[in-house]
Amino acid sequence: MSITTKQFQKETDLNPVWDFMVEIYDREKGGGVAAPFFEYALFSSWMDKSYVHLNRLWFDGSRVVGFVFNEAPVTDIYFKIRPGYEFLAEEMVDYAMKEMPDFDNKQRFMLFNGQEYLMEIAEKRGFTQQYDYEDRQFDFSKELNCELPEGFHFVKDADADPLKLAKCCWYGFNHHLDKGEFENWTAEDTSGEWTPAVSYKGILEDFRNPPPHSTYEYTVIIADENEEYACYSGMWWVPENHLAYMEPLCTVPQHRRKGLASAALTQHYRRLKPLGATHMTGGGDPSYEKIGYGKGIHWYCYARHK
């Protein structure tokens, strides 16, 4: 056994990290987030990439056995460890505490069922649990059958419009409440703030240069009678894990509580179950339970009070 480390580099390490996270994915035992979680954030326009170079990989020979990384905010730290290499956990925790972002003492460890040994180490280092929640999944042994309401239709993948999608996401994620209306989306923006221009630029880049493991052909977009986008549900299909990884999901305010999100999830179910999918991700909102979502992965947030 020859353990070495290196700092993450997007150009060379993206595929090894994806393969590693796919290989150790365990729906039953847990052990952390699925592979799309990291790549989706890394290629997003909403994540601060300034500290990606602090992400670190552990290798046994040429085989990835551990990975520490951040997401958004940059002070949220995640761990992935290959089974059999749990002995690296203390070293990985110490590295995270010493080298990864901890601005204003806000560093948090985002841990999961199957990572109880990491929780014990974190507690010894002065971390305490702040909250926890169940990130629910839908088991495809059950049927999902929520039809599209009258007056709405699915948009063909080839017809997807990045500007309409940017507008849908702006209002669907309630950015208008604190950042104003969706305007000036073509303006040059160097403010560093989340603006319509930044949002539109990010989605346009996704259309032109999608992340390498993305499967945008399975994205679901729902439009109203005026061809305005009302609901958007992204999809990363991971056949090796039989996983339909749904991210993100939003509905514009004027069309909420009409069953659009449920219809979008049903469309994913109908497309991907024949391909071999056995389960689909969702979230912690109670609305998922109402349409049949059940046990998924359990999040535990740990932080220190200095």
Name every feature range the model reports, one short phrase each:
Residues Q107-L111, M246, H279-G284:
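Conserved hydrophobic beta-strand within the GNAT/NAT acetyltransferase core sheet
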Residues M1-Y40, E147-V198:
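Short amphipathic alpha-helix that is part of the acyltransferase structural core
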Residues K6-L14, I24-M100, D224-E225, A230-E247, ...:
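Conserved donor-binding loop and adjoining core beta-sheet/short helix segment
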Residues H53, D104, E217, P274-A277:
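Short, high-confidence coil segments that cap the C-terminus of an alpha-helix
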Residues E71-T75, P83-F152, A158, W299-K306:
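Acyl-donor-binding surface of acyltransferase catalytic domains
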Residues L42-L57, G61-R63, T190-K201, R208-I221, ...:
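A short helix-loop-beta-strand connector motif used in the catalytic cores of GNAT acetyltransferases and
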Residues E86-K98, T251-P253, R257-P274, K290:
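Conserved acetyl-CoA-binding loop-helix of GNAT-fold acetyltransferases
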